[in-house]
């Protein structure tokens, strides 16, 4: 089966696992998925990320994070730039997700960054997704 948007599939798998209160999620690896998973870990949306190497492309294991009473840390994920409609923003036009409570993940010339990091480095890029 050919997948036209592996990033949207990755975000949907995270959203579905989160809604079902799963602890661990495994997805086929790619460099951009690894980058997105590392940003989610760095920003505190997931507990941990493991990269499992195999003889094929590898697997990313994402450990989802919940609050003490089981409340979800990730309340929303939204794919912004899609294969059919790419969305690019200049540095001065970078969005703030929920007035700074969420993050925007961008693909820039400096690599994958959050909106806050892109503002600090003074770069714009393709808006991959919003996470809040």
Swiss-Prot record:
It comes from Streptococcus sanguinis (strain SK36). This is Small ribosomal subunit protein uS8. Belongs to the universal ribosomal protein uS8 family. One of the primary rRNA binding proteins, it binds directly to 16S rRNA central domain where it helps coordinate assembly of the platform of the 30S subunit. Pfam families: Ribosomal_S8 (PF00410). GO terms for cellular component: ribonucleoprotein complex; ribosome. Part of the 30S ribosomal subunit. Contacts proteins S5 and S12. GO terms for molecular function: rRNA binding; structural constituent of ribosome. GO terms for biological process: translation. InterPro entries: Ribosomal_uS8, Ribosomal_uS8_CS, Ribosomal_uS8_sf. PROSITE patterns: RIBOSOMAL_S8. Keywords: Ribonucleoprotein, Ribosomal protein, RNA-binding, rRNA-binding.
């Amino acid at each position: 089966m050919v997948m036209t948007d592996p990033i949207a599939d990755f975000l949907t798998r995270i959203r579905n696992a989160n809604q079902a209160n799963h602890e661990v999620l495994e997805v086929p690896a790619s460099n951009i998925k690894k980058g997105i998973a590392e940003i989610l870990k760095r920003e505190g949306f997931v507990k941990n990320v493991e990269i499992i190497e195999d003889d094929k492309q590898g697997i990313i294991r994402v450990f989802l994070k919940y609050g003490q009473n089981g409340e979800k840390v990730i309340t929303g994920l939204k794919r912004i730039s899609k294969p059919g409609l790419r969305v690019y923003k200049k540095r001065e036009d970078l969005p703030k997700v929920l007035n700074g409570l969420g993050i925007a993940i961008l693909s820039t010339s400096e690599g994958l960054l959050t909106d806050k990091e892109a503002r600090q480095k003074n770069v714009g890029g393709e808006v991959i997704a919003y996470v809040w």
